[in-house]
């Protein structure tokens, strides 16, 4: 991500991997960051991204946050990270899209892009809420139950019944 942004004319302050949240907040403030990018390759990174978003909010930082990496998703970004941060939080699937998004946010489309993002994220959160709250009436659940005709199934009998002791 850093190389792609640098090749597109952006100054990048690369803090490396496994960077503590406090250091990210300090760097964002010290450099007056226009954008902040977080990338996660493993599942624990998702919790750390939430912590960073919360810490940035508490420090009063509102720069757009770009979320990417193998374990991330638009749904997780909308449902878990964005609510913890006052600035816009974008899920970026492809690292090559970071400079495109950054340029869009630097231009006349900034407010429109942020408004669209917030609308889409609200839609995702509402869909997730509906799916989490969805339950079937008992009659429908019984209608959908698994039906197995055991008389037609070939069951394999064990070759030995009882207890065996191995030395």
Please give the residue ranges for each predicted region.
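C-terminal accessory/binding modules appended to enzymatic or scaffolding proteins
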Residues: 1-10, 161, 166
């Amino acid at each position: 991500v850093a190389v792609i942004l640098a090749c597109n004319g952006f100054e990048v302050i690369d803090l490396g991997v496994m960077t503590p949240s406090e250091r990210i907040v300090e760097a964002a403030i010290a450099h007056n960051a226009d954008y902040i990018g977080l990338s996660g390759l493993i599942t624990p990174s998702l919790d750390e991204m939430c912590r960073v978003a919360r810490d940035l909010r508490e420090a009063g930082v509102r720069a757009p946050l770009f979320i990417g990496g193998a374990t991330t998703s638009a749904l997780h970004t909308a449902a878990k990270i964005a609510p913890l941060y006052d600035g816009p939080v974008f899920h970026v699937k492809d690292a090559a899209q970071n400079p495109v998004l950054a340029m869009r946010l630097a231009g006349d489309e900034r407010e429109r892009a942020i408004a669209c993002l917030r609308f889409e994220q609200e839609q995702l959160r509402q869909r997730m809420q509906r799916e989490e709250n969805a339950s079937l009436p008992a009659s429908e659940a019984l209608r959908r139950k698994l039906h197995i005709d055991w008389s037609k199934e070939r069951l394999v009998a064990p070759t030995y019944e009882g207890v065996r002791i191995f030395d």
